[in-house]
């Protein structure tokens, strides 16, 4: 929980060059990613789902495609069936019509037969497309929910030091915006890709059946022109990557400012924050324009090469017909052949054209996939602990020559030694920056010391899992934090199996029961960290009740009574007094009344223990503690 001072410091870092942040970030782009590998991982994510669901989508897509292609050919050849030429020989699919239906039927009856056949095909196409879209969307939503859950799980498994170097807004953007882009890739492009593969195989087969020579020439021209498109794809992807990275930076800035809006208003920083926002907003413009320009160009380019391919095919077929060159296929080169061939060729180019029209979604999906996979590929802290469950702990705490710093080149604690017995009330005293909160952070196992050892009873901290270690510790921070939910649910966060009766008793111990009962819905009143009808003191009493229900043998109080009014302070001190009973308590506070009652005061400065003793002993020594207290009184 950040204090106001830390909030201002945190916001000020946005004014630094963002390159500094990229260097320290574990999610920064240190190497050029491979788009095909990312795309393959996205495909494997689909493959990893229930095979039957994937099969249903593919079956619907295949039948829809086959019906559509067949319908196009039936429609083209049906014209020849309706209006037969004087040639007694019939080619291609016209023969099918004549075999099924009498060739001597009147024109209107022939028209009816063709129309009914085509309408039935359209109904089948519609049915298969609806089924494919529904099943596909359901499948893709499940995949994205799984990706989002895995990414969130990975983030939750990371150590506290990970969050010291990460942009929270960027993490949120990866879990929301990037997963949304992946969903669009699956929903818009996934089904289209399945269709495209089978359309290409089906129509290519039809083209080669009609005329293998002309088909080979047409497809060669088409493939050669498509190959030129890949010259622009790398540039387009780089532009989209820049857009997403800038969006993550901007999201981080917005999250930081909005979460500290009170500090911004108190310090009248609105204009400064607006100017800083523009530094993140404006860089979004040019990369976005550039990325979309590439997408439009690629789409238009493919439309151009499709038309060139059609023209080339017609020219070649005409040349074959004029020079009496056989088609080497099942049909002679005539009017019906041209209709069938161009229809099949259009069906070949159409899915590719549709994919190129969605190229912006493809690039965004690949870039977003890379950003999400960077989270999934993070190495979780190594679980070296061999003890996953601690027995009943008394709460004896011992530091042995502990050395630690938030950066390797700047140690904050240098050889901390002290020993605390069960039931002691320990006050940690020192000037700002001496390392008081760092000791609390190490006790909570948020960080690993560079050197030295920390013991709880006879268990060394590195041998115990984080969960088992923290089960034995309760903490009350300077800034009370409330979860979104009812008061009862908030208190139960301290211990999930607590009964309603235990929650009420804990609130009575914490002096919170009376004001809770004055609320309209009592313990079922909905609150959140932004609730404004609870005072700071009342919010702190709720966090104390949460610590009471936890009933851990070690208690940490980090400035728990600062910024509290006199009436609330008395209630909080009473509740803390009850809470500390039969516990080993560590207190960080500037209030003399709280420090005076400590059984042991540890005085630290510049990362070292200078003095230890109770208040009277340290005052008689007339050392650093005595000078610190006299200066505080002045």
Curated annotation (Swiss-Prot):
SUPFAM superfamilies: ABC transporter transmembrane region, P-loop containing nucleoside triphosphate hydrolases. ATP binds at residues 430-437. It is found in: Cell membrane. The keyword Membrane applies. GO terms for molecular function: ABC-type transporter activity; ATP binding; ATP hydrolysis activity; ATPase-coupled lipid transmembrane transporter activity. GO terms for cellular component: plasma membrane. Keywords: ATP-binding, Cell membrane, Membrane, Nucleotide-binding, Transmembrane, Transmembrane helix, Transport. The keyword Transmembrane applies. InterPro entries: AAA+_ATPase (IPR003593), ABC1_TM_dom (IPR011527), ABC1_TM_sf (IPR036640), ABC_transporter-like_ATP-bd (IPR003439), ABC_transporter-like_CS (IPR017871), P-loop_NTPase (IPR027417), Type_1_exporter (IPR039421). The chain crosses the membrane at residues 54-74, 111-131, 189-209, 213-233, 296-316, 325-345. Coiled coil: none annotated. Pfam families: ABC_membrane, ABC_tran. It comes from the Bacteria. SMART domains: AAA. Its main location: membrane. Residues 54-364 form the ABC transmembrane type-1 domain. It is a multi-pass membrane protein. Residues 397-631 form the ABC transporter domain. Belongs to the ABC transporter superfamily. This is Putative ABC transporter ATP-binding protein MG015 homolog.
């Amino acid at each position: 929980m950040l204090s106001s001072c830390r909030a201002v410091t945190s916001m000020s870092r946005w004014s630094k060059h963002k390159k500094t942040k990229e260097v320290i970030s574990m999610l920064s782009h240190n190497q050029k990613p491979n788009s095909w590998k990312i795309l393959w991982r996205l495909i494997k994510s689909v493959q990893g789902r229930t095979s039957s669901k994937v099969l249903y989508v593919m079956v619907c897509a295949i039948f829809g495609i086959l019906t559509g292609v067949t319908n196009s050919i039936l429609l083209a050849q049906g014209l020849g069936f309706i209006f037969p030429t004087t040639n007694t020989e019939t080619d291609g699919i016209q023969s099918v019509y004549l075999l099924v239906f009498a060739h001597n039927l009147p024109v209107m009856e022939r028209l009816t037969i063709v129309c009914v056949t085509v309408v039935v095909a359209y109904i089948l196409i519609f049915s298969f497309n609806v089924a494919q879209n529904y099943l596909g969307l359901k499948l893709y939503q499940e995949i994205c929910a799984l990706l989002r859950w895995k990414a969130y799980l990975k983030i939750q498994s990371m150590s506290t030091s990970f969050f010291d170097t990460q942009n929270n807004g960027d993490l949120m953007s990866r879990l929301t915006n990037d997963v949304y882009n992946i969903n669009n890739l699956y929903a818009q492009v996934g089904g289209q890709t399945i269709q495209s593969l089978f359309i290409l195989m089906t129509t290519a087969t039809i083209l080669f059946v009609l005329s293998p020579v002309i088909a080979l020439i047409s497809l060669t021209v088409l493939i050669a022109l498509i190959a030129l498109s890949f010259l622009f794809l790398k540039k387009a992807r780089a532009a989209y990557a820049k857009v997403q990275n800038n969006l993550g930076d901007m999201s981080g800035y917005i999250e930081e400012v909005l979460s500290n809006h009170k500090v911004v208003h108190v310090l009248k920083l609105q204009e400064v924050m607006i100017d800083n926002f523009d530094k993140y907003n404006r860089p979004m413009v040019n990369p976005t324009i550039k990325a979309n320009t590439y997408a439009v160009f690629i789409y238009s380019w493919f439309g151009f090469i499709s038309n060139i391919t059609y023209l080339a095919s017609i020219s070649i077929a005409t040349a074959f017909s004029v020079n009496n060159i056989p088609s080497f296929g099942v049909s002679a080169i005539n009017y019906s052949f041209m209709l069938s061939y161009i229809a099949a060729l259009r069906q070949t180019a159409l899915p590719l054209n549709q994919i190129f029209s969605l190229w912006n979604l493809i690039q965004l999906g690949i870039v977003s996939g890379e950003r999400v996979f960077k989270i999934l590929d993070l190495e979780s802290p190594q679980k070296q602990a061999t003890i996953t469950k601690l027995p009943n702990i008394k709460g004896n705490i011992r530091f042995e020559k502990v050395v630690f710093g938030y950066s390797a080149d700047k140690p904050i604690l240098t050889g901390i030694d002290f020993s605390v017995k069960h039931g002691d009330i320990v006050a940690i005293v020192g000037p700002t920056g001496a390392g008081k909160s760092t000791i609390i952070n190490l006790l909570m196992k948020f960080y690993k010391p560079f050197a030295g050892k920390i013991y709880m009873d006879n268990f060394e901290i590195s041998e115990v899992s984080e969960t088992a270690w923290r089960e034995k510790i309760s903490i009350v921070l300077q800034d009370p934090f409330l979860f979104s939910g009812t008061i009862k649910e908030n208190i139960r966060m301290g211990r999930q199996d607590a009964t309603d009766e235990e929650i009420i008793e804990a609130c009575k111990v914490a002096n919170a029961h009376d004001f809770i009962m004055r609320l309209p819905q009592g313990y079922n009143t909905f609150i959140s960290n932004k609730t404004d009808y609870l005072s700071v003191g009342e919010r702190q009493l709720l966090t104390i009740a949460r610590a009471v229900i936890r009933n851990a043998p070690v208690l940490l109080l980090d400035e728990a009574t600062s910024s509290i009014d006199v009436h609330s302070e008395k209630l909080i001190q009473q509740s803390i007094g009850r809470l500390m009973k039969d516990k080993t308590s560590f207190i960080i506070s500037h209030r003399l009344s709280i420090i005076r009652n400590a059984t042991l005061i540890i005085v630290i400065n510049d990362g070292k223990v200078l003095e230890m003793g109770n208040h009277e002993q340290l005052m008689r020594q007339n050392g650093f503690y005595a000078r610190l207290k006299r200066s505080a009184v002045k």
